[in-house]
Amino acid sequence: MMAWVMGLPAIAHVWDELAILARPNNEGTFTLEKYSFLQPTTYTNAVFFDFDNDENLDLLIMGQGGDWNISGDIKFVTLYRNLGPDEDFRFERVPDAGFLQRRDEGFYNPISTGDFNHDGYTDVLIMSNQNGRHIDLYLNDKGTGRFIRQEIDFEAATNGSVMFGDLNNDGWLDIEYSGYSDKTSTALKTYINQQNGSFADLTPDNLTGAFQGQSTLADINGDGTLDIISTGNGDNWACLAPIYY
């Protein structure tokens, strides 16, 4: 049955792969631009971040085809450079950015960005599932538009989320993620930044995560350290929402 996305009758069919940029107008409304130089996808995750330090937010999109206009076998991890005010903030695809073309199996939070090595450029952390489970860390090559995959031995998980955050207050970004791993359906891992390009698995024994859900970091109790909130499904499809202080 034909159906249309509410509010987008002239732009988007619900089964269509989409890429819509909503630009704010002065009167508080938005102008919707279909495709807008962006790759249409389904099962999409997108993150704005400034990869080249020009003070314009760039865009990273993960997704796949939906067997409507694009084969579902085709996966995308695509980087777009914001061309700034001289080009009306139009986005231009960055060729050969270095990301492996695969996506995660859920709709959760498989991308995080942050400067893990203190070089002043924002790096990218990605969870994906393509011929196995993967947690991939990509080093920003000085804002050139190239990202270099780092050889770090993470215990991979999928169907969950990844986060950068300073877990031990040493001023360096650590890594936390939850999801379904090859060992357990309720993986929750913490990797501490060793300040030399490597990470150490220092996961406390009491941490239990979830799949088909999300985990996030926040200082809930105001003690100056990040806490972990994990939500999703566990064994036997139990609904879980643990908080770790």
Predicted regions and their residues:
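Glycine-aliphatic tripeptides that mark coil-to-beta-strand junctions in extracellular
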Residues: 1-9, 55-61, 120-124, 171-177, ...
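Beta-propeller blade termini
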Residues: 1-4, 44-53, 108-118, 160-167, ...
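Structural signal for beta-propeller blades
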Residues: 18-20, 68, 77, 133-135, ...
